[in-house]
Amino acid sequence: MPTSATAVAPSTGSVQKKDQDWRAILSPEQFRVLREKGTENRGKGEYTKLFDDGIYSCAGCATPLYKSTTKFDSGCGWPSFFDAIPGAIKQTPEAGGRRMEITCAACDGHLGHVVKGEGFPTATDERHCVNSVSLKFSEISSQ
């Protein structure tokens, strides 16, 4: 169930844990994706079709990563965002150069990939293709 979010500032500290500590707080699927760079099945993620107002945080360390205002339906089968909260993610080029791996800047958890230049009508022409299992959604309640 979504929780209420108040702040949208990314974590500035580095979250480091041993594998046994990550296993204690993550589900087996979360561990496989976040810590072993896996990918969840296309179209099966909890947040693929969620477009409520809120914040998407790292499921591993709770660092806010994406605002719902940057989420869009790309049709790829995973949650898609055109931009992250500044400083929240790291991008690392993969072999071939077309895709960039994205990880949480605080805990290095694998989130997914960024693909650029696909022509989506967004402000950045980027698609951050993120595994739902890497995320935790917090609804922003209207006041």
Swiss-Prot record:
GO terms for biological process: protein repair; response to oxidative stress. Keywords: Cytoplasm, Disulfide bond, Electron transport, Metal-binding, Oxidoreductase, Redox-active center, Transport, Zinc. Disulfide bonds join 76-129. Its EC number is 1.8.4.12. One of its GO terms (cellular component) is cytosol. Its main location: cytoplasm. One of its GO terms (molecular function) is peptide-methionine (R)-S-oxide reductase activity. The active site is at residue 129. Binds 1 zinc ion per subunit. Residues 19-140 form the MsrB domain. It is found in: Cytoplasm, Cytosol. Signal peptide: none annotated. It catalyses: L-methionyl-[protein] + [thioredoxin]-disulfide + H2O = L-methionyl-(R)-S-oxide-[protein] + [thioredoxin]-dithiol. It is an enzyme of class 1 (oxidoreductase). Zn(2+) binds at residues 58, 61, 104, 107. Its cofactor is Zn(2+). Belongs to the MsrB Met sulfoxide reductase family. Catalyzes the reduction of methionine sulfoxide (MetSO) to methionine in proteins. Plays a protective role against oxidative stress by restoring activity to proteins that have been inactivated by methionine oxidation. MSRB family specifically reduces the MetSO R-enantiomer. This is Peptide methionine sulfoxide reductase B9. It comes from Arabidopsis thaliana.
